[in-house]
Amino acid sequence: MKNIAIIGAGMTGLSLAYNLQEHNITIFDKSWRPGGRVSTRKHDNYLFDHGAHYLSTNHSVNQLNEVISRYNLGQIIEIDFAIDFLKNKKTRKKIIIGQNGMNSIPKSIFDNIKVKSYLNSKIIKISKNSNELFSLFSEKEEFKDFDYILICIPYLQSKELSKELIDFTQIVSEPSYDPIHTVMLSYKDINNINVKAGLNLHKDISFFMNQNIKFNELSHDCWVLNMSSEYTKNNIDIDKPELEKYAQSIFEETFDIKNEISFIKSHRWLYAQTKVSYNSISKKNWINSKDNKIFLSGDWVLGKSLSDAWDAGEKFSHYIKILSI
């Protein structure tokens, strides 16, 4: 049995923890809760899935389906979906959502695997000790005696944390991300919008989704808008009020909304979704140190979806099992 530290409690980190439960696992995350970008925001009586919006029913990661079924984490709903709103292409679409928001999926997995964890703990340094074991350091604490360190955070953050321990000259081409501004907005009265989610609402808004179809307790009309990655990159440091006003104006003009807005807030995801995956440029499923003790993984290995993140962890876990025999 090995002592294994997992840095990052997103879907890849949770997948690793789930698949390596025969070892002594400790999970670290800078956030106060697990899930990473599978995030549900609560503001007063408003609820928004402002990270991952849903899980496709067509994904091919069998173990993730098994976990969702085993712990009763999701439900399938069918909604009116715009395949391309600007071209008026619409369909009925089945999607998987969390039982209580998308974050309830990783949170329930985390609660069920019952591993040792340190949330609200940002790891800022990794060092190798004289006994060939590793220590992790947050700003306040040291965590000792780990056999393996599995880093499951966005690639650039992983690289910065492990640059003294991994030879990154071996990486000829690096994975990349697209940033996305997300806008959450709510109206006191329900708007009569006949499509519940979709793509290409506007040249600057790549995705939109109603939240009332996920949270039955919502009395106000709540929506999440994703600005396009191109718009976000061109306006990466835009003032939030300016961004929110712009997104609101597009949304209201598109759907001829006359109701008064009751809430609006934006969030910038610098590492919103994988643009170029590591596997697509290297044919590899992780990055490792020469001594096979420090590893990097994440959704950026395989793709941009929630299922890609889980799949990256599951694939990687098989190698760790072989190493630790």
List the predicted regions and their residue ranges:
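Active-site substrate-recognition segment that forms the wall
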Residues: M184-N235, Y246, I250-F255
